[in-house]
């Protein structure tokens, strides 16, 4: 079982490039493109690699400041959401990391921030160390769509992970509209799994198809009786009409079969939900899977009414690239 450095790491990384997060403006990224902050893969060191501006670094790096002030980057999150925590990662930045950093946020239904935008400080200035992860909890009920990441006075940061719960205005979704109820962009999140040795459980809810085998959820080889599983909270309660299980890129390591259970959960913690999931109703009976393919199940889906959570069971183990649970929202 994966050990998380901070409890909030189980939430969706709202600042993931795969969700569409990008830099809108930056005071300076002379040495390294600020958009590298959002890459889902860990930062790497490339020994002896230089470009026209100096040593190639996997992250955002500004020039040495020779005047007053500090550097900042304005960020559009791929999906707006309420913030739970942040990881400011300075991996491989040793003599060139910022001594401190802070984070501000705002919510805009449309458009981009300008000089009149009111920013809310969600993380006051914190000290940074070189080649380190810095985990800080954030507690704000408000949803935010944009961030302003400040580093004092200059330097380099490898990755910025901003964990939270995606936000969607469900009042604009009609009851006749079929949507992916578990998509990360719709607020779906993986909350527990039996194992995620090779790939994060949250990957299966990302938009698009997986880019490679690492862009999915894969368990270790099971050497004991039983099967692997992952529990997903829907972005909104709804009735399921179709399920898509995608094993793209998984060829010698795809599950032999899968099934799905569902439940309407009222209250309780994530750990309590994990225990209760053993007794959830069958939504999709066991279905055979094949390698490197999308599997659509509609006629096989049982009508069990509105649900809030699903449990994907894979037998006995293996990898799944994406999971889509299509249906209509329930009011």
From Swiss-Prot:
Matching PANTHER family: ALLANTOICASE, INACTIVE ALLANTOICASE-RELATED
Family the UniProt entry places it in: Belongs to the allantoicase family.
InterPro entries xrefs: Allantoicase (IPR005164), Allantoicase_dom (IPR015908), Galactose-bd-like_sf (IPR008979)
Pathway, per record: Nitrogen metabolism; (S)-allantoin degradation; (S)-ureidoglycolate from allantoate (aminidohydrolase route): step 1/1
Protein name per the record: Probable allantoicase
Record's keyword terms, sorted: Hydrolase, Purine metabolism
Record GO terms (molecular function): allantoicase activity
GO annotation (BP), single: purine nucleobase metabolic process
Catalytic activity: allantoate + H2O = (S)-ureidoglycolate + urea
Superkingdom of origin organism: Bacteria
